[in-house]
């Protein structure tokens, strides 16, 4: 994977833990990640907020303050001491938030001011639509967070552009109802995502940057009427920045909890993207191996299986029984 010498194709997928009290990662996190580290293995951190307005859930980690950077350092060092390659997932929740999680109790920001249609428990506060002149500030938050991640020792960053969070809220036409240069056409809807990629790549170098996308998913009421076109456009557009990898969620994962029968495939996106391609979404040992053997991906990310089996690469190697 360019400058990174991987010893296997199994990636630890990003998984939120919500144990970073005060948005500061705690010392015990080092054990959690080290248990899942192998020499030459790639791990992607839990979603990490790029700013105070990026937050959505209680006790999620951030990386916009000095004390957060300092708290991450021994955790990253511990992973490196076990030979792991560690990327920080940079995240902004957008409208998937409540005012209690926002500074001064303000409304969360988004590409839109549309509230969730299905929110019977009022879990989410109706969002405030970002003004066009505010968007560069959010882009800069991602840039600074990437700089902070490298200061903390991370090998690189993954931009969270999936699962209905802010970047996805701009890309998906079921959410984005803007009439400015960030809404309407596919090119306009993807503009924000690509500007974030450009800013982060210029800050830390494209060889240290990846992005996670879920064009086919309809999570957090963020679906698209033409997900294949969206995925292909993004895969092709990323090439001009020469970033390290593109991490895509399988079409069968319309939500984060169910696997659906699906005829769609990520193969067109895999063929369109020039860098390392990572797939995720309901993979087993067998179909992960098959996907690699058939050239449909370079790497396979596992979430739940890695959570239940910290030694997942060894179990896969031995074809040993797995905890569920």
Swiss-Prot record:
It holds the Pfam family Oxidored_FMN. The active site is at 165 (proton donor). This is Putative 12-oxophytodienoate reductase-like protein 1. Belongs to the NADH:flavin oxidoreductase/NADH oxidase family. The keyword Oxidoreductase applies. Residues 99-113 have a biased composition (Polar residues). GO terms for molecular function: FMN binding; oxidoreductase activity. Keywords: Acetylation, Flavoprotein, FMN, NADP, Oxidoreductase. SUPFAM superfamilies: FMN-linked oxidoreductases (SSF51395). FMN binds at residues 14-16, 47, 89, 212, 282, 303-304. Residues 99-128 are annotated as: Disordered. InterPro entries: Aldolase_TIM, OxRdtase_FMN_N, Oye-like. It comes from the Eukaryota. Substrate binds at residues 160-163, 252. The modification N-acetylmethionine is found at residue 1. Putative oxophytodienoate reductase that may be involved in the biosynthesis or metabolism of oxylipin signaling molecules. Its cofactor is FMN. Its EC number is 1.3.1.-.
């Amino acid at each position: 994977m360019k400058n990174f010498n991987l010893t296997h194709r199994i990636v630890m997928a990003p998984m939120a833990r919500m144990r970073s009290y005060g948005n500061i990662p705690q010392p015990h996190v080092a054990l959690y990640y080290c248990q899942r580290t192998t020499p030459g293995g790639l791990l992607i951190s839990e979603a990490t907020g790029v700013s105070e307005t990026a937050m959505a859930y209680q006790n999620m980690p951030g990386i916009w303050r000095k004390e957060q950077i300092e708290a991450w350092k021994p955790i990253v060092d511990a992973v490196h001491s076990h030979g792991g390659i560690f990327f920080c997932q940079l995240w902004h929740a957008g409208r998937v938030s409540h005012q209690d999680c926002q500074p001064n109790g303000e409304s969360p920001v988004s590409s839109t001011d549309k509230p969730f249609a299905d929110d019977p428990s009022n879990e989410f506060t109706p969002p405030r639509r970002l003004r066009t002149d505010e968007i560069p500030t959010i882009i800069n938050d991602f840039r600074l967070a990437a700089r902070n991640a490298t200061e903390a020792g991370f090998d690189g960053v993954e931009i969270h552009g999936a699962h209905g969070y802010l970047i996805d809220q701009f890309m998906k036409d079921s959410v984005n109802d803007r009439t400015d240069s960030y809404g309407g056409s596919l090119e306009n809807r993807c503009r924000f995502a690509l500007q974030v990629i450009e800013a982060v790549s210029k800050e830390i170098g494209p060889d240290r940057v990846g992005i996670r996308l879920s064009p086919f998913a309809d999570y957090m009421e963020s679906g698209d009427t033409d997900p294949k076109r969206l995925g292909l456009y993004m895969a092709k557009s990323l090439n001009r920045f020469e970033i390290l990898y593109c991490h895509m969620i399988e079409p069968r994962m319309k939500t984060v909890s169910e696997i659906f029968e699906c005829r769609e495939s990520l193969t067109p996106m895999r063929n369109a993207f020039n860098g390392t391609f990572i797939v995720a979404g309901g993979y087993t040992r067998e179909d992960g191996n098959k996907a690699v053997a058939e050239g449909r991906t370079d790497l396979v990310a596992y979430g739940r299986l890695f959570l239940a089996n910290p030694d997942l690469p060894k179990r896969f190697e031995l074809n040993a029984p797995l905890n569920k």
